[in-house]
Amino acid sequence: ILKDIKEYNLENRVVITSYDWRILYELKKQNLNVLRGFITLQQSLTKTKKNIYEDSPWMGKKFSPDELFLLPDTIKNLEGHVWSVFYKDVTKQNVEIAHKHGLAVTVWTVNREPDILRMIEYGVDGIITDYPKKIQEICKSKNISWF
């Protein structure tokens, strides 16, 4: 994939995002110009287990309790570009911190109107949803110019 990204000069237009941070570390070793997005999940879901916890193999190395708690700081220190966070784990304060660090913030999987509106209010940069048309309709009906 790196070969194609380089060949078509897409380094600053493509974000490679992963739940397994070890992949992102390897990408950094191979090419510093590839934008990297760090997926975080601090609570287990029905089909997906959390990846942010002490000694998590998904994080690829050991982090202090502060680093596990202050994820925007941790991702900045890892020279990441995007924090892709489960929407129930994000706060407005963390979005503001991430933006101060120059990180874009995307949230996933946001499907309910109250949650969509809250994420827009928080100032996230992107919403991953199963219902993109629903977000368009909500924004249009409420005169929200978000995207």
Residue ranges and their predicted role:
Residues 1-147:
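Short loop-to-alpha-helix "cap/lid" segments that border enzyme active sites
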